[in-house]
Design a protein with these regions (language model features):
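An amphipathic, aromatic/His-enriched active-site/gating alpha helix that lines ligand/cofactor pockets
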Residues: 1-5, 23-46, 51-56, 64-107, ...
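Surface-exposed interaction/gating patches
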Residues: 9-24, 110-188, 226-229, 234-237
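The conserved glycine-aromatic submotif of the RRM
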Residues: 52-60, 171-178
Length: 237
């Protein structure tokens, strides 16, 4: 049976952490997002961003919603006057403020080939890290860049043992793509960076310039609440 295109919508959060609150905040987030039954979005991951590759202290979260209607339901529960913010969610937000000071969010639309949360879990992919690329692309070219990633580049990464976790374009703008890759070991991360300076890596970047204006890669380190963490369990809390 042919695989159905990914029809989900995703919330990507970049969280500014207060002081040494990263571990407590990730645990707080993981307990909400794992095996949830409240109608909210399941958590794909809550990662620590490596300070040597980007801002710190920073946590990145990724949540999966079952399409636009599901997001609308979540917005209704969060913002409408008739319902008010649900008591449990309000309590969660209030407690979270002791560990975070703000953040920046994106709604992401997956490429057809981008795996769902269930597909990531089913493949059993596990890793010590996650390579995140946020690319600025020429207006209107996000889908073409994603198509190239889904063909040539995904195969090249797979040969290195690096599996795709997600490939998305950012909603409400037409100039951004987000890619997430599973890194089995930190040694493979170092190998990836070294190979990027080689013939194949440079050839890919030359090709990508047909669409990409600039990009930024950062290393994300998974917590046990990330579905690709070696110790992840479906019913962990």
């Amino acid at each position: 049976m042919a695989r159905m295109p990914n029809g989900c919508v995703y919330l990507h959060e970049t969280i500014a952490i207060t002081g040494t609150g990263s571990e407590a905040y990730k645990a707080h987030t993981g307990k909400l997002g794992t095996a949830r039954r409240d109608g909210g979005a399941p958590l794909i991951g809550t990662w620590q961003q490596s300070g040597s590759t980007g801002s710190w202290p920073t946590v990145v979260n990724l949540w999966e919603m079952q399409g636009w209607d599901h997001w609308a339901e979540i917005l209704e529960r969060q913002y409408t006057r008739s319902s008010g913010q649900e008591a449990a969610l309000k309590e969660w937000w209030t407690e979270a403020t002791q560990w975070r000071s703000g953040g920046f969010d994106r709604i992401l639309i997956p490429a057809a080939f981008s795996p769902t949360r269930d597909e990531i879990v089913a493949t059993g992919v596990r890793g010590a890290g996650c390579l995140q690329e946020i690319a600025t692309v020429k207006p209107g070219t996000a889908e073409r860049y994603l198509a190239a990633v889904g063909g040539t580049w995904r195969r090249a990464m797979s040969r290195r043992g690096v599996a795709l976790l997600g490939a998305y374009r950012t909603a409400m703008r037409e100039t951004e793509v987000v890619l997430l890759w599973n890194l089995p070991t930190f040694a493979q991360f170092a190998t990836y960076l070294r190979d990027a300076e080689g013939t194949a890596g440079k050839a890919w970047r030359r090709r990508a310039r047909a669409w990409v204006v600039d990009y930024r890669e950062t290393l994300l380190v998974p917590s046990p609440w990330c579905v690709h963490h070696p110790d992840w369990r479906a019913n962990a809390s």
